[in-house]
């Protein structure tokens, strides 16, 4: 039935494949059995330009006539002449993609023609947002093989190219980053296996088959990419409503032993992915794509942003399919005659499950690809063993009784991963998410028994695609021709131009000849593409595919040296989120035995920019490497960069660093003899943080950009741990240094990860990383681990760690020449590595500082186990070559950069489906815990929504590892396992685990050492700061501020700390604001206010330096809402007599003759007076007494100045005093007041006033007294008579009431006796002159003699009338007496 999208695609879809599928004539003598139709995944029928027929096994009816997308043809479009593939070219695939059991590598080689010799030019242009794929290639001998068997191509090694990119499901069509991919190798052919298009996404799996004439290298890649969501450019929705794309990359490489210069064979198990039926209806669709590559051709790696660079749209609509990927393990062929050592890779990769429409539930499964690189130790004859995984199977059972690496049986409990709380059903009805069985890629290298050549090849196939986000991470093994081994240029990812060139001698042409990767750094959402470096044909490619849902693509870098070179193994795990910058780095350091030259290569990836520098320089792609022509290539830099963790694992050393900060481990060996690579043991889980660079090479730590590090430290995204160590690490590494991990912490949050760890029963695990609480059962195994950062270094940042900074372990073990005897069927030693610890999530607790990695208390035992042991290489004949190499002292330091594995649970999209991570411990050390968590690794998990942060736990290998002993179980399929154990004790203080200059002292404690810390530090590793301020070390007036490793005493304003005392200094401060309008022309021209501060400080120092006792000037600028506040402070010694006026004058002169920048001069000139009085008093108020003093700071010291009339005994007094009464202040001295004055300052004359008033009052009183006395003494005797006779009417007689005698009218003598009664009482009533006062007397009467002469007092007995006579009228009776007074 035709897919709903069949109408969209032009019928000639396969015309695109036509130029790539031209087959060369088979070499004479080469015979291949005809492929069985039942086993053919796809058949390439000859077509005459009209297109070719693509037959999909078991789903033929669903193939609509494919139509290619818009297509740009390159030059030399191939004509319609297309030749059918030779019978030998026919591809075979066993049932379920399994390779037939039994057989040998030789038999596998015979399936391929050996005449692929013609050169061809390939120009492939990819438009990521466009569905254009133009390929121009003249090619012959193209082989499309679907069988899981190893096939030997012609004598020319072939290059593997995996170009599988998927369009962004989230409609990220807006950014069409264009990637130009040009292949110009000579003598290579191109092969495109198949292209399958899911309904909403494009599945493009193309194999560029590049045969070369030097050696045969076969590599098959099955690429399945399923992508959910509809690509924005496609514009049509699926009929089924399901948008799903998934990509599984499986690669196989075999190398035929045609010449001694062959590259190590790389063999990756093939993946068969049967698609499950939608709605339980419709035939299943199995896709199997193989890429064959010549070993000599570089691997061209194309990383695209969310859109796929190559989109081969197959009309077949893929509904949601449950993909059970079964991985057949293929044993790499061994060189019969002195060929370079071959590396076998067994790829067990889990493809992501298909995704349901509407993204109701996206199941993301990251493939756990474990590339195990076994040093040439044991070669297993068994190639046919294969591991098959069925999503619905309860167990994951390897069909062959003898597992290829001695893994007798792999139990995969509960193969179908569980999403959320429920287990994902493996039935075909499941549309929301289909279970994916994950297999691991096991990379095994066989050392050639010739010339001591050591070749190790990393082959990591990590196809992790989430249904939600199409993150297809492809692992690209790279075959390097032995002939061009010595010339190579590091592939450089340039930040601006996403061009990576791999210089190779085999490419005689210039930059065009060098294989170039077009890495589009401008991919939307911060896509990162990383090209691994390759030295001497060491091809490291890190492909990071950004998916719309922030998935990160895990790319493994595989690189090998063959001819006389030390095998260099590097694996780069790139996981980046779309929004977060991931810095992934691949470091390969090669040193010639005769040269001390070394190169450190690093990729620092920042947001949308890829930068690769070689020795600090951008290396342009060139045919020759600038300095690396080396005969001895130190193998070791397996670098794994994870969003939060990068683990560098090597048998010699393991280095863990934060993924945010790319860690570079480079080791160069100067040993004259070819080093014996150590077997990769489960050291990947060891916390061997020691790197073994030679003494001449210093470890270069790549300091990741703060941008990159910051997002990661904050990103909760889980990080897969791809733990691969190069087995070919030379033993003759004279020095090991522990590079310090970057300063960023690894994982912000922890999350649980149920992981099933499979341990091979027959293998002795050198290091069992199985956590104590972890069980082999996948279901029961859910171990939450809290992130532990063992040590936080106080140092702020890490720039680089010189070799001498860490103690090195010297080991020398030349490769014995006996290795040259390896037979054609060497079985790779199945070194058992129980990588069970994967589940707990290895955490890279990365040192935040430049301090060397510290051993965490719980991790490795104090004694570093010797990671050495004779390696038994068994040939099929049973001859065993025992390579005993001197001990390599690798301190087992569980450093802060411990191995960290990402939490195995992946929360896909908004759904809470958790995918348990299962890791099968491969026989080699390599273990990639990278679960299809490509998306998960990236903080892209944000887009995933509920993905909890990975838990990070420092793996304590001390429990699992037998201290001081390392056992390698080397087992041949035909031989009984040989266990070689070597024990050596290593001083725990070799790497100086004590931080902050602490002294390490070895002892017999559990940790094996203790640290003598400096006074400022404490703790087991001297990582805890001591708060010195608790002991009050500062003066009483100073404030103590604790710092990391020290403290600061800060004196108040106006004081300066000198000799432990805050001394008073002359301080002039000011503060002014600059408005925004002014800032637009001056300050804002500077990117940072720090520049303004520095400029002003420089100007002030220049101005005031001429003044005496000048100390310094400080400037502080701060931004406010609409202005910038600038504070100035200038200090002088107290002995200086500088005043504020002096500073103002000097400042004015400086401004007038300003020699600073125009902005600063304008800034200072805008202020009329920079320093103003009172500024210091505002900041430092001495609390003066307002009544008696005021604050002044004119002389640079805030003092209380007394008001007039007041004085101070001390100038520092805050108040003033006045003199006492009777004193006044004269010349600052109190003087007594003059007479009569007193009070304050003698201003009160009260004494004088008192004297005057007292005298006046006394005199007055005296006068009054005298007057009174005088008055009293002066009396008049006549007063009575005067009163009586005052007037004539007044009578003093008591008889006044009686009337007068009328008869008496006159008062003469003759009339007085003539009264009425003859009484004389009336005499008293007379008012005549007789008794009148003297003053009243009439003078005339006196002259006439009328007045009598008697003037006696009245009341007397004497009569007034008759003076001198007795008065008869006087009555003495008291009763009648009347007092007249």
UniProtKB/Swiss-Prot annotation:
One of its GO terms (molecular function) is calcium ion binding. SUPFAM superfamilies: EGF/Laminin. It comes from the Eukaryota. Residues 424-444, 620-648, 774-784, 792-809 have a biased composition (Polar residues). The chain crosses the membrane at residues 1249-1269. Disulfide bonds join 989-1000, 994-1011, 1013-1022, 1029-1040, 1034-1049, 1051-1062. The keyword Signal applies. Residues 25-37 have a biased composition (Pro residues). GO terms for biological process: cardiac atrium morphogenesis; cardiac muscle tissue growth; cell-cell junction organization; endothelial cell morphogenesis; heart development; in utero embryonic development; lung development; lymph circulation. Interacts with CCM2 and KRIT1; KRIT1 markedly facilitates interaction with CCM2. Receptor component of the CCM signaling pathway which is a crucial regulator of heart and vessel formation and integrity. May act through the stabilization of endothelial cell junctions. This is Protein HEG homolog 1.
């Amino acid at each position: 039935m035709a897919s709903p999208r069949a109408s969209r695609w032009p019928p000639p879809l396969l015309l695109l494949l036509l130029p790539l599928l031209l087959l060369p004539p088979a070499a004479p003598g080469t015979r291949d059995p005809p492929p069985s139709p039942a086993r053919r995944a796809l058949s390439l029928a000859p077509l005459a330009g009209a297109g070719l027929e693509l037959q999909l096994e078991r789903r033929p009816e669903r193939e609509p006539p494919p139509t290619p997308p818009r297509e740009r043809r390159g030059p030399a479009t191939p004509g319609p002449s297309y030749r059918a593939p030779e019978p030998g070219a026919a591809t075979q695939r066993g049932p379920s993609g399994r390779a037939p059991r039994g057989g040998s590598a030789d038999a596998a080689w015979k399936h391929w023609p050996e005449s692929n010799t013609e050169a061809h030019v390939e120009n492939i242009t990819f438009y990521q947002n466009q569905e254009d794929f133009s390929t121009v290639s003249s090619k012959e001998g193209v082989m499309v093989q679907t069988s899981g068997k190893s096939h030997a191509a012609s004598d020319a090694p072939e290059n593997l190219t995996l170009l599988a990119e998927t369009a962004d499901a989230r409609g990220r069509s807006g950014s069409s980053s264009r990637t130009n991919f040009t292949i110009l190798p000579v003598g290579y052919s191109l092969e495109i296996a198949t292209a399958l298009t899911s309904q909403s996404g494009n599945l493009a799996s193309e194999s560029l088959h590049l045969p070369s004439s030097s050696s045969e290298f076969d590599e098959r890649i099955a690429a399945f990419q399923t992508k959910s969501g509809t690509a924005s450019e496609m514009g049509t929705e699926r009929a089924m409503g399901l948008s799903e794309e998934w990509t599984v990359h499986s690669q196989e490489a075999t190398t035929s032993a045609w010449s001694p210069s062959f590259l190590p064979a790389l063999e990756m198990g093939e993946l068969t992915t049967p698609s499950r039926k939608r709605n339980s209806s419709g035939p299943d669709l199995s896709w199997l794509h193989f890429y064959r590559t010549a070993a000599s051709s570089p691997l061209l790696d194309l990383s695209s942003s969310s859109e796929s660079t190559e989109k081969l749209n197959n009309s077949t609509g893929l509904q949601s399919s449950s993909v059970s990927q079964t991985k057949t393990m293929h044993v790499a062929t061994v060189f019969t005659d002195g060929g370079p050592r071959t590396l076998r890779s067994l790829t067990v990769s889990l493809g992501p499950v298909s995704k349901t429409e509407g993204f109701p539930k996206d199941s993301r499964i990251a493939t756990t690809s474990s590339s195990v690189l076994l040093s040439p130790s044991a070669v297993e004859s068994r190639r046919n063993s294969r591991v098959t995984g069925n999503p619905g199977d309860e167990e994951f059972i390897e069909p062959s009784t003898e597992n290829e690496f001695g893994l007798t049986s792999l139990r995969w409990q509960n193969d179908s991963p569980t999403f959320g709380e429920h287990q994902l059903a493996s039935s075909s009805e499941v549309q929301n998410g289909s279970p994916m069985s994950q297999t691991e890629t096991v990379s095994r290298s066989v050392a050639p028994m010739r010339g001591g050549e050591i070749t190790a090849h990393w082959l990591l196939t990590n196809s992790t695609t989430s249904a939600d986000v199409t993150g297809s991470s492809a692992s690209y093994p790279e075959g390097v021709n032995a002939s061009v081994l010595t010339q190579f240029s590091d592939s450089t990812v340039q930040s601006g131009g996403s061009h990576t060139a791999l210089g190779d001698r085999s490419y005689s042409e210039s930059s065009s000849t060098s294989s170039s990767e077009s890495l589009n750094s401008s991919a939307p959402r911060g896509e990162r593409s990383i090209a691994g470096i390759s030295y001497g044909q060491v091809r490291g490619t890190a492909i990071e595919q950004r998916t719309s849902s922030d998935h990160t693509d895990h790319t493994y870098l595989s690189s090998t040296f063959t001819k006389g070179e030390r095998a260099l193994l590097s694996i780069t795990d790139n996981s980046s989120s779309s929004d977060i910058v991931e810095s992934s780095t691949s470091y390969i350091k090669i040193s010639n035995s005769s040269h001390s030259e070394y190169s450190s290569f690093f990729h620092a990836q920042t947001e949308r920019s890829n930068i690769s520098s070689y020795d600090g320089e951008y290396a342009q792609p060139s045919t020759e490497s600038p300095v690396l022509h080396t005969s001895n290539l130190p193998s070791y830099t397996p670098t794994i960069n994870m969003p939060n963790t990068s683990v560098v694992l090597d048998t010699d050393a393991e280095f863990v660093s934060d993924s945010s900060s790319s860690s570079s481990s480079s080791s160069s060996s100067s040993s004259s003899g070819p080093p014996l690579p150590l077997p990769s043991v489960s050291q990947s889980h060891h916390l061997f943080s020691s790197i073994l660079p030679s003494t001449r090479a210093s470890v270069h730590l790549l300091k990741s950009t703060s941008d990159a590090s910051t997002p990661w430290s904050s990103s909760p995204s889980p990080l897969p741990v791809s733990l691969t160590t190069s087995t070919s690490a030379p033993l003759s590494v004279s020095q090991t240094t522990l590079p310090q991990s970057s300063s960023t912490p690894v994982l912000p949050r922890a999350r649980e990860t149920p992981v099933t760890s499979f341990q091979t029963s027959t293998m002795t695990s050198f290091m069992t990383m199985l956590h104590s609480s972890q069980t082999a059962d996948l279901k029961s195994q859910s171990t939450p681990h809290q992130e532990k950062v063992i040590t936080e270094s106080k140092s702020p940042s890490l720039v680089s760690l010189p070799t001498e900074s860490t103690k090195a372990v010297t080991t020398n073990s030349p490769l014995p020449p006996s290795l040259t005897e390896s037979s054609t069927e060497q079985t790779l030693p199945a070194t058992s590595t129980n990588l069970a610890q994967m589940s707990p999530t290895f955490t890279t607790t990365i040192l935040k500082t430049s301090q060397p990695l510290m051993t965490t208390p719980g991790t490795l035992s104090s004694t570093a186990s010797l990671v050495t042991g004779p390696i038994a290489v068994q040939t099929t004949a049973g001859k065993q070559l025992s390579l005993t190499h001197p001990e390599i002292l690798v301190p087992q330091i569980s450093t802060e950069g411990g191995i960290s594995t990402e939490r195995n649970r992946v929360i896909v999209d908004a759904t809470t489906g958790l995918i348990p991570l299962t890791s099968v411990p491969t026989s080699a050390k390599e273990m990639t815990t990278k679960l299809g968590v490509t998306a998960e690794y990236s903080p892209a998990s944000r887009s995933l929504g509920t993905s909890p942060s990975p838990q990070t736990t420092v793996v304590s290998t001390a429990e699992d590892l037998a201290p001081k002993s390392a056992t390698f179980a080397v087992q041949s399929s035909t031989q009984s396992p040989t266990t070689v154990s070597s024990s050596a004790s290593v001083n725990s203080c070799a790497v100086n685990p004590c931080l902050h200059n602490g002294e390490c002292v070895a002892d017999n404690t559990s940790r094996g050492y203790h640290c003598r810390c400096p006074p400022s530090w404490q703790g087991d590793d001297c990582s805890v700061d001591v708060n010195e301020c608790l002991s009050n070390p500062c003066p009483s007036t100073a404030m103590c501020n604790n710092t990391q490793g020290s403290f600061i005493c800060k004196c108040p304003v106006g004081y300066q700390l000198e000799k432990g005392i805050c001394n008073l200094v002359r301080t002039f401060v000011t503060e002014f604001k600059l408005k925004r309008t002014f800032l637009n022309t001056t300050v804002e021209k500077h990117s940072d206010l720090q520049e303004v501060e520095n400029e002003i400080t420089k100007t002030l120092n220049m101005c005031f330096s001429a003044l005496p006792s000048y100390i310094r000037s400080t400037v502080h600028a701060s931004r406010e809402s609409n202005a910038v506040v600038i504070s100035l402070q200038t200090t002088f010694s107290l002995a200086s007599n500088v005043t504020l006026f002096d500073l103002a004058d000097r400042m004015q002169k400086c401004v007038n003759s300003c020699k600073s920048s125009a902005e600063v001069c304008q800034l200072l000139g805008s202020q009329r007076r920079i320093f103003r009085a009172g500024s210091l008093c505002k900041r430092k108020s001495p609390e003066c007494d307002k009544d008696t003093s005021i604050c002044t700071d004119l002389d640079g010291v805030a003092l209380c100045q007394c008001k007039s009339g007041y004085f101070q005994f001390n100038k520092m007094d805050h108040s003033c005093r006045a003199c006492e009464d009777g004193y006044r202040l004269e010349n600052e001295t109190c003087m007594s007041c003059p007479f009569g004055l007193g009070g304050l300052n003698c201003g009160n004359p009260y004494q004088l006033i008192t004297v005057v008033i007292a005298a006046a009052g006394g005199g007055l009183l005296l006068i009054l007294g005298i007057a009174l006395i005088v008055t009293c003494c002066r009396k008049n005797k006549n007063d009575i008579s005067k009163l009586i006779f005052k007037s004539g009417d007044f009578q003093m007689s008591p008889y006044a009431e009686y009337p007068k005698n009328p008869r008496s009218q006159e008062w003469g003598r003759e009339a007085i006796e003539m009264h009425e009664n003859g009484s004389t009482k009336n005499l008293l009533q007379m008012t005549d002159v007789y008794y009148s006062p003297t003053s009243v007397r009439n003078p005339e009467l006196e002259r006439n003699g009328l007045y009598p002469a008697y003037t006696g007092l009245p009341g007397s007995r004497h009569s007034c009338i008759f003076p001198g006579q007795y008065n008869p009228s006087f009555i003495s009776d008291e009763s009648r007496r009347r007092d007249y007074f």
